[in-house]
């Protein structure tokens, strides 16, 4: 079967890989000049099922109110503009903030994330792909005792659903990652997830695209997409700057652009862009930079060692499709990295970056079938696109091929939003 994949980020490229392995004739279309140059380019680097707790949970509302008006807020909503999609998304977000909904959404996200981590391990063993990976786990650190206790309760939900999470004392945290020694006295505790990983998502995407091309996948670069063309209950083609591309099936993996492409077809995807920030710091003192990936819960920032670089990333800014970096937020990340790892690298040579993540109100991706019989979704992964990329790609490849997914699809599709009135 001829299949077109729309988008060559880590999710779209993984989709192409698994579709090619299933025997399909695959074409990937992307407006950029190579793979993984937007959301996947300089993210936090974590393969993190441990981050399955959704943004919408009972504890987030007091925090959002506290953060209102602060440019340095970890989660910044710019509500002072009339954007019906943003306000509708916000109402759905509020509807998912109950404890029961948060646990349901944690299980759904974790189901995909654990499967994806296993798929990544199989792919790595099969191909030998290298991407500055560290298979050393992820350590969450907490300075506030109440936040640590809340995190331990949230960890129990994930443990029930199959994820190993281990509460640790401050001394145990620095034993796991000695580079935390400068802040041991500030810590209330930590939670270690030993089976999680980290690695360079852009390098992985670029290498996987090369492997996919060797399997016959065609990548069409520098081809802006204009629209999806419908014919009744099917997609008839993809209108691009380079003409119309036709196939038997289409996989929409265009990240934040997915709802823009779907809307003219009558398909409303509840996805909004969340701008994330990172800085990449050259490591000039290997003992001072962490090897275990770290999540600083207080500041909602993550740190991953990528070879001779330290990637620090975090915060989320709901500001529409504005891709321009906010220097205040990049500086915030850099300052926190310097405080946590004072000997971690040459902070004066840090490279700032900002990119948009496609976020759903419940933090669960949109996977699988749509009302259009030959259009499939692989989008809406939020901050966990790298984490869920391989599993999501394999799921969609199975469904396109007419095979059942290896995991339950319950609650992962667009149909879960049909009960809403907005």
UniProtKB/Swiss-Prot annotation:
Pathway: Amino-acid degradation; D-alanine degradation; NH(3) and pyruvate from D-alanine: step 1/1. Its cofactor is FAD. FAD binds at residues 3-17. GO terms for biological process: D-alanine catabolic process. One of its GO terms (cellular component) is cytoplasm. GO terms for molecular function: D-amino-acid dehydrogenase activity. Its EC number is 1.4.99.-. The keyword Manganese does not apply. It is an enzyme of class 1 (oxidoreductase). It catalyses: a D-alpha-amino acid + A + H2O = a 2-oxocarboxylate + AH2 + NH4(+). Keywords: FAD, Flavoprotein, Oxidoreductase. Oxidative deamination of D-amino acids. HAMAP family: DadA. Belongs to the DadA oxidoreductase family. This is D-amino acid dehydrogenase.
